[in-house]
Amino acid sequence: MAGNRRIRVVVGGVFDILHVGHIHFLKMAKELGDELIVIVAHDETVKKRKGRPPINPAEDRAEVLRAIRYVDDVVIGEPGEISLELIKKLKPDVIALGPDQDFDCRTLKEKLRSIGLKVEVIRLPYLYKEDRAKTSKIIKRITEIFCD
């Protein structure tokens, strides 16, 4: 913390079927600052990006995230692409991207700078080499086990 100024970190994602990879991502993001705010993807955004609706609605995903000790606040994003206005409103010092998020750090930083925000954009690494911490792999395993 620089003086009395709190460092605000913002992350975003779907966070559907929460797993250990999400927890480690949130923990690493929290370690970058004093306050962690999570933007949960809107249901329509999930459907558009993944080609299917989320398993759990945004309100439920947000409630689960609020229960995690690393998370200080949760907001549900707007439908569509990342909302620069929402990010501007949240006033982050740092935006932490997950290892599998398809945002380019430099491009995102330039977009933020174009609306007057100087934000550090960091890509966090995978903690696991295998696929056990990926929602799509978990869904596949569930269907293999329970849907003969």
Curated annotation (Swiss-Prot):
EC class name: transferase
InterPro entries cross-referenced by the UniProt entry: Archaeal_FAD_synthase, Cyt_trans-like, FAD_synth_RibL, Rossmann-like_a/b/a_fold
UniProt pathway annotation: Cofactor biosynthesis; FAD biosynthesis; FAD from FMN: step 1/1
Transmembrane portions of the chain: none
Keyword field: ATP-binding, FAD, Flavoprotein, FMN, Nucleotide-binding, Nucleotidyltransferase, Transferase
Subunit structure: Homodimer.
HAMAP family noted in UniProt: FAD_synth_arch
Protein known as: FAD synthase
Organism: Pyrococcus abyssi (strain GE5 / Orsay)
Biological classification of the source: Archaea, Methanobacteriati, Methanobacteriota, Thermococci, Thermococcales
Name of encoding gene: ribL
